[in-house]
C-alpha cells in the first residue's frame, strides 16, 4: 500500500485502513512510506511501537525484489505516478488498485485493475472507512487504525468545517465506535514553539496582489514545512478581500512544494494541475522537481494572476 511521497494524515490514515482489510483477509501487507514524512512522525512512531504492526512499514527500495503476479498494489490519496512514494512498484506489480478523492488527472497510473475515485468525498480516509464499514463483520479496525483514519478526515475537512457531508459524519461515527480517540488526534496536531514561530513568519512574509491573491514562501527547509504551508494558506483566507492563497515551500533536495487554497470563488486545482499536481477547487497542491523556489514562486504568481484576470473577465462578460 502506498500514497504520495511526503505523506500527510489523510494519506497515512487511508493506507492504515487498507492494511487493516488486508490483514483481515490473512494477507501479508506493507505500507511504503517515503523518507520525507516528518509531518506524520508522531503517529508513525506510535504504530511502530505496537507489536501488532511489526514490519508493517517499509521504505522505497525495500521491496526491490517484489515482482510477483499475485501481489496487489493499492495506491491511496493519489493517482499521479511521479508523486508516489515508490513509483518503481508500478512497473513491477501488475495488479494495481487506486483509491482517491482527487479529480482524475491526465497523468494517471497505467492499466489499473480497479479505480475508485469519488471526488465528492471529503478525503481518502473517508472512502476507505466506508469500505471498512461494508467489508464484513469480521473486520474491525484497531484503536490505532481508527485513530489514523479519523485524523485523516479531521485534517482534510479542517475539523469538519470544509467539505464534510452526511457520509463524512457517518464514517466518523463508525470510527469513534471502533475506538478512534479525538484527544489523541488533538495531541497529534499540537504545534511546538518552533513551528508556531515559523507559521507566524510565513504569514508575515506573504505578498498581496490585486484580485484577492496572496502568495507566501517558506525558503528554508523545515521538518514540517508542508504542514506550516498548509496552515498559513488556510489562515490567509480569513484576510478580508482574499480569494486565493498560495504558499511555496522548500522540501528535501531540489523539490519544491506548493499549497493552494481558495474561498470557493476560484479553482486552485486548475492552477496546480499546471505544475503536475491536483486536488479540489478550494484545496490543491503540487510538488515541483529540480527548480529553485524563487522560480516556482514567480511562475505561481504569474499563473495565478492570469487565472484570476481571465476568471473575472469571463464573469464580467457573463453578467453583461
Label each residue range with its predicted role.
Residues 96-98, 114-116, 213-215, 247:
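Conserved beta-strand scaffold positions in the cores of enzyme catalytic domains, especially
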Residues 18-19, 90-93, 114-115, 171:
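Glycine-rich, phosphate-binding/catalytic loops in enzymes
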Residues 12-14, 42-45, 86-88, 108-111, ...:
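Short acidic, glycine/serine/threonine-rich loops at helix termini
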Residues 1-7, 11-56, 60-71, 150, ...:
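Hydrophobic helix-and-loop "lid/oligomerization" segment in the mid-to-C-terminal part
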Residues 61-64, 84-88, 115-118, 138-140, ...:
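A generic local secondary-structure boundary/capping motif
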Residues 57-111:
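Active-site cofactor/cluster-binding pocket
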Residues 90-91, 145-147, 266-268:
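Short hydrophobic "helix-edge" motifs at membrane interfaces and signal-peptide entry regions
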Residues 101-172:
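Short alpha-helices
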Amino acid at each position: 500500500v502506498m500514497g504520495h511521497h511526503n505523506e500527510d494524515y489523510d494519506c497515512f490514515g487511508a493506507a492504515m485502513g487498507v492494511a487493516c482489510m488486508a490483514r483481515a483477509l490473512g494477507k501479508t501487507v506493507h505500507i511504503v512510506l517515503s523518507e520525507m514524512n516528518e509531518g506524520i512522525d508522531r503517529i508513525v512512531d506510535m504504530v511502530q511501537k505496537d507489536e501488532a504492526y511489526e514490519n508493517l512499514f517499509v521504505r522505497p527500495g525495500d521491496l526491490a525484489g517484489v515482482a510477483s503476479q499475485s501481489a496487489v498494489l493499492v495506491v491511496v490519496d493519489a493517482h499521479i505516478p511521479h508523486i508516489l512514494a515508490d513509483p518503481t512498484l508500478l512497473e513491477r506489480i501488475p495488479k494495481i488498485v487506486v483509491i482517491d478523492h482527487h479529480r482524475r488527472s491526465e497523468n494517471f497510473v497505467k492499466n489499473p485493475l480497479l479505480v475508485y475515485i469519488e471526488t465528492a468525498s471529503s478525503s481518502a480516509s473517508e472512502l476507505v472507512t466506508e469500505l471498512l464499514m461494508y467489508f464484513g463483520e469480521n473486520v474491525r479496525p484497531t484503536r490505532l487504525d481508527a485513530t489514523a483514519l479519523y485524523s485523516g478526515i479531521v485534517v482534510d475537512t479542517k475539523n469538519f468545517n470544509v467539505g464534510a457531508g452526511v457520509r463524512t459524519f457517518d464514517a466518523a461515527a463508525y470510527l469513534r465506535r471502533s475506538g478512534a480517540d479525538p484527544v489523541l488526534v488533538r495531541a497529534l496536531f499540537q504545534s511546538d514553539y518552533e513551528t508556531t514561530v515559523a507559521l507566524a513568519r510565513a504569514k508575515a512574509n506573504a505578498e498581496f496582489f490585486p484580485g484577492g491573491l496572496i502568495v507566501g514562501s517558506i525558503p528554508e527547509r523545515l521538518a514540517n514545512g508542508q504542514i506550516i504551508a498548509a496552515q498559513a494558506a488556510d489562515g490567509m483566507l480569513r484576510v478580508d478581500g482574499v480569494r486565493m492563497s498560495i504558499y511555496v515551500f522548500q522540501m528535501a533536495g531540489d523539490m519544491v512544494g506548493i499549497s493552494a487554497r481558495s474561498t470557493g470563488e476560484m479553482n486552485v486545482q486548475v492552477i496546480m494541475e499546471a505544475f503536475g499536481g491536483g486536488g479540489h477547487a478550494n484545496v490543491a497542491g503540487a510538488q515541483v522537481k529540480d527548480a529553485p523556489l524563487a522560480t516556482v514562486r514567480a511562475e505561481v504568481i504569474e499563473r495565478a494572476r492570469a487565472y484570476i484576470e481571465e476568471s473575472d473577465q469571463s464573469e464580467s462578460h457573463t453578467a453583461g
